[in-house]
Curated annotation (Swiss-Prot):
<dbReference type="GO" id="GO:0080025">
    <property type="term" value="F:phosphatidylinositol-3,5-bisphosphate binding"/>
</dbReference>
<dbReference type="Pfam" id="PF02194">
    <property type="entry name" value="PXA"/>
</dbReference>
<keyword id="KW-0963">Cytoplasm</keyword>
<comment type="function">
    <text>Plays a role in maintaining normal neuronal excitability and synaptic transmission. May be involved in several stages of intracellular trafficking.</text>
</comment>
<keyword id="KW-0653">Protein transport</keyword>
<feature type="modified residue" description="Phosphoserine">
    <location>
        <position position="496"/>
    </location>
</feature>
<dbReference type="GO" id="GO:0097352">
    <property type="term" value="P:autophagosome maturation"/>
</dbReference>
<keyword id="KW-0813">Transport</keyword>
<dbReference type="InterPro" id="IPR001683">
    <property type="entry name" value="PX_dom"/>
</dbReference>
<dbReference type="InterPro" id="IPR037892">
    <property type="entry name" value="SNX14_RGS"/>
</dbReference>
<dbReference type="InterPro" id="IPR016137">
    <property type="entry name" value="RGS"/>
</dbReference>
<dbReference type="GO" id="GO:0005770">
    <property type="term" value="C:late endosome"/>
</dbReference>
<dbReference type="InterPro" id="IPR037436">
    <property type="entry name" value="SNX14_PX"/>
</dbReference>
<keyword id="KW-0597">Phosphoprotein</keyword>
<feature type="domain" description="RGS">
    <location>
        <begin position="284"/>
        <end position="416"/>
    </location>
</feature>
<keyword id="KW-0966">Cell projection</keyword>
<dbReference type="InterPro" id="IPR036871">
    <property type="entry name" value="PX_dom_sf"/>
</dbReference>
Length: 894
């Protein structure tokens, strides 16, 4: 009975547990927790839209994350590491930019922009490294690639007995699967160029890739002068030995001899501008507030970025604070303030709001508590810090993020290029516009400046709809000149001769003006080229009577204005763009094709007269400078004339067709025959575009490209045979995890006996998860030691010397041999004694020797480095996996 019970237990255990069944981690005291770094965001990140979270959001710009604009904000490192990195980047500029730039100019503006770009690139890398789980990447992906590399070395060693030929045999074993960068040094440089270009959208500031000259310069500096020497440094056997000693050394880590340095903003000192001259590309928010045209441009820029509500929140809180700080608030005022606070909470704090802004949780909780409590509690906000800190947070975003972005935006460049010649340069926004100072200088605040009014003011500025029966014309504007509507919105104040006699500071009230269109007249077109044949075009005669200045002693004024048919539609489109549509004041459908002669205009006279009269009765247009210009003689001529499309004259087009269809009489036969003969000849090869290659400031290109250590890499031609070798690339890799990797190395490299291999397979169920958890924990501890301040400074110094110290003497051969010997001894001592008893001393020596010899081959190290680099790049930039076309473009030339 006991025997059968034992058999039944064995059968049950065997059937219930298979090779895929694994016992959980049995070391409860060792728990590896992946490092999670909470990075501040401008707006909450949703599934698609970073602002509102909607999948199909058409309002906001996607991915409004902090790292997209100024990734160095809230990023701090120790001052010593920061100084070391700054020194390396300074050497990059000193060696690869200043030697030729100083011959051009001594202005530091361009170099200052380059400093910001390099800081942006380094900050993006730091943030993305923080986001990935380094131990998991090492154990799950990098070690797997290393296993494949080890198998190639083992198969190559079976073919050659002499270590001198191991590298060439391994390269032949790789066959066509050799990394494309290893074919030759020029292919390696070309690969780094393509890789750098592929990463530009993610490592450079937004829209920086639009500047072709800047991207070419940065590409050559990074690929030829930074990445190539860095990869040479990492693949150098002497460097590999140094890193191995650091990793497998069980002695206590070297303690820092000096106390830890304080944390400083990442590369802030490096990015400080060196240019002593004031730059027009640097504005303060205060300057924008003081100039109405700049404020309008800034608001339009925020609209494009999907961040108008950031400015709207700032203005709303300013108004709210001014009202709540009044002494002795009445119940009605407290009730009004409480209702406004509820709107603030619902608009900017709720997750479902499209205008939600990310605040600290305690800020949202405090605002929610007051908003949902009795209205009397609103006075507590006078002493609470929640609303003040929310305002400071949003103001910081405007000053530190969006203002610098605005200074590099197309909107601001339009202001710089056209502001001097445009009448909008010194103009003021009309009554429907918004000014930050309006909220601070206005004495009568009260209910009229509530959040609803503020929201409608901002949103009304950017409302863009098409009038019923009207078409918003293009007016023949060339590409890149699409902002003429903006210039019509921010209109002239003092160009009209009628306005010149106005009393200073006298408000204009267009509602008191009286207009009529009594008749249609003819007007000679001044744009006609020939004076004797000036075209007479029909125009509307508008009689204007101004009666709004009687209070200051002015008599009613009368004048007449002549406007063309299309000028009315220019006025309509500009008013629509700025103020939205007016349902009770609309022009009839515009005639696109057909004559616009005297009879046609006469039939439209009453409709156009009614349209203007209704516009004058709208309160929001009572002080409109645009409408006043339209009704003033010589007012805004360029606004309403320059952008008009010429009339489409079908008669002229039809009359010109027969002339074009006349039968040719052979006068063009000879050019046709010559072109035909040329088309039959094979085209001559076009000269290749010269490539700018910046490799070294002190050595010739070939000296840097072909060095003594790596020679010409594998020295393969591009058309090498494509025959597939019978190696691991044709086999399915089933190993997964550190336990499987150890079994694989034990079987392939250390040649463990069968009984030990079977025992390890049996204990895999019990210890696989435990070993892998311990490995992640161990790697994390080692990485923390490696990332200590003094060690990081040491590694950065070594990298600096490898790239820039060309004139210094390299490590002597004796020092390198001493380092290699120490590495071999450390590897021998790293193997546990229990394993040595199972496999024997001789097998241990041969196996370690095989691994050690494989690591002493520079080209093989470079192969492994590039394979690992590709994996790391895909982990740091997972967006590359989703863009198949870009990936194909990089590998198509392989």
């Amino acid at each position: 009975m006991i025997f059968w019970s034992f058999v039944a237990g064995v059968v049950t255990f065997y059937c219930s547990l298979g090779p895929d069944s694994l016992l959980p981690n049995i070391f409860f005291t060792i728990k590896y927790k992946p490092k999670q770094l909470g990075l501040q965001e401008l707006f909450p990140q949703g599934h698609s839209c970073a602002v509102c979270g909607k999948v199909k959001c058409k309002r906001h710009r996607p991915s409004l994350l902090l790292e997209n604009y100024q990734p160095w904000l809230d990023l701090k490192i120790s001052s010593k590491v920061d100084a070391s990195l700054s020194e390396v980047l300074e050497l990059v500029l000193e060696n690869f930019v200043y030697p030729w730039y100083r011959d051009v100019t001594d202005d530091e503006s361009f170099v200052d922009e380059l400093r910001i770009t390099l800081r942006f690139f380094a900050s993006v890398l730091i943030r993305r490294i923080h986001k990935v789980d380094i131990p998991s990447i090492i154990t799950k992906k990098l070690l797997k690639a290393a296993m494949k590399h080890i198998e190639v070395i083992v198969k190559a060693r079976q073919k050659v007995k002499n270590t001198e030929f191991l590298q060439q045999a391994a390269l032949e074993e790789y066959g066509p699967e050799l990394h494309v960068a290893l074919r030759s040094r020029r292919d390696e440089l070309h690969y780094l160029r393509k890789l750098t270009e592929l990463l530009f959208p993610y490592i450079l500031p937004p829209k920086a890739t639009d500047c072709r000259s800047l991207t070419l310069l940065i590409r050559e500096i990074l690929s030829g002068s930074v990445f190539l020497p860095s990869l040479d440094f990492l693949a150098d056997p002497d460097t590999v030995n140094h890193l191995l000693i650091i990793f497998i050394d069980d002695s206590p880590p070297e303690k820092a001899t000096e106390p830890a340095s304080p944390l400083v903003p990442f590369l802030q000192k490096f990015a400080e501008p060196r240019n002593k001259k004031p730059s027009v590309l640097k504005l303060e928010l205060k300057q924008i507030r003081e100039q109405q045209d700049l404020l309008f441009r800034f608001m339009n820029f925020l609209k494009q970025e999907g961040a108008v509500h950031v400015l709207q929140f700032c203005l709303t809180v300013e108004e709210f604070n001014d009202r709540i700080l009044r002494p002795e608030l009445s119940n009605d005022e407290m009730l009004s303030l409480h209702e406004e606070l509820q709107k603030i909470y619902k608009t900017y704090c709720l997750d479902e709001s499209i205008d939600k802004i990310r605040f600290d949780p305690f800020i949202v909780e405090e605002i929610q508590r007051i908003a949902e409590g009795p209205y009397i509690d609103v006075v507590k906000l006078q002493t609470m810090r929640c609303l003040f800190e929310a305002y400071e947070h949003v103001l910081s975003l405007l000053e530190n993020v969006f203002t610098p972005m605005f200074c590099h935006s197309d909107e601001y460049f339009r202001q710089l290029l056209r502001g001097a010649e445009s009448p909008t340069r010194n103009s003021k926004l009309n009554r429907g516009s918004l000014s930050l100072d309006d909220f601070r200088n206005t004495q009568k605040r009260g209910e009229s400046f509530g959040i609803s009014r503020i929201g409608s003011k901002i949103k009304g500025v950017f409302k863009s709809t098409t009038m019923e029966g009207a078409m918003l014309p293009n007016y023949g504007v060339a590409e890149g000149e699409d902002d003429f509507i903006e210039e019509g919105i921010v209109v002239m104040e003092d160009d009209s001769p009628v306005e010149a006699v106005s009393t200073p500071n006298t408000p204009r009230n267009l509602a008191a003006w009286k207009i009529s269109i009594p008749y249609v007249d003819f007007f000679e077109d001044p744009s006609s080229e020939r004076k004797e044949k000036k075209e007479r075009i029909p125009v509307f005669c508008i009689d204007v009577e101004r009666n709004d200045r009687r209070a200051v002693g002015h008599e009613p004024e009368h004048w007449s204005v002549y406007r063309r048919y299309l000028e009315f539609y220019v006025l309509e489109s500009k008013l629509t763009e700025f103020h939205g549509t007016f349902p009770d004041a609309q022009l009839p459908s515009k005639r696109i094709i057909g004559p616009k002669n005297y009879e046609f205009l006469k039939s439209k006279r009453e409709e156009f007269q009614e349209y203007l009269q209704k516009l004058l009765q709208h309160p929001e247009l009572s002080n409109s400078q645009l409408l006043a210009d339209f009704l003033s003689p010589n007012g805004g001529e360029t606004q309403f004339l320059d952008k008009i499309l010429p009339d489409v004259n079908l008669g002229k087009i039809i009359k010109s067709v027969p002339g074009k269809l006349m039968k040719e009489k052979g006068q063009h036969l000879e050019p046709f025959i010559m072109n035909f003969i040329n088309s039959c000849e094979s085209p001559k090869p076009k000269p290749s575009r010269p490539e700018l290659t910046i490799l070294s400031p002190t050595s010739e290109n070939n000296k840097k490209l072909f060095n003594d250590l790596f020679k010409n890499n594998a020295n393969r031609a591009e058309n090498t045979e494509r025959k597939q070798n019978q190696n691991y690339f044709m086999e399915v890799m089933t190993v997964e995890g550190v336990y499987d990797y150890l079994m694989y190395v034990g079987r392939v490299v250390f040649q463990v006996p069968d009984w030990l291999h079977h025992l390890l397979m049996g204990t895999r169920i019990l210890f696989k998860n435990t070993l892998e958890m311990y490995t992640d924990y161990y790697l994390q501890c080692k990485l923390e030691q490696l990332f200590q301040e003094h060690r990081l400074v040491s590694l950065i110094t070594l990298l600096r010397d490898a790239i820039f110290c060309e004139n210094t003497e390299p490590r002597s051969l004796q020092d390198k041999q001493k380092g290699a010997k120490q590495t071999f001894e450390e590897m021998m001592n790293y193997i546990p004694d229990l394993l040595v008893k199972c496999i024997g001393e001789e097998t241990k020596y041969e196996s370690i020797r095989l691994l050690f010899d494989g690591l002493q081959q520079p080209v093989l190290n470079k192969q492994l480095t590039y394979v690992l680099l590709d994996i790391v790049i895909q982990e740091l930039f997972p967006e590359l996996n989703k863009v198949q076309k870009e990936v194909t473009s990089v590998t198509s030339w392989m």
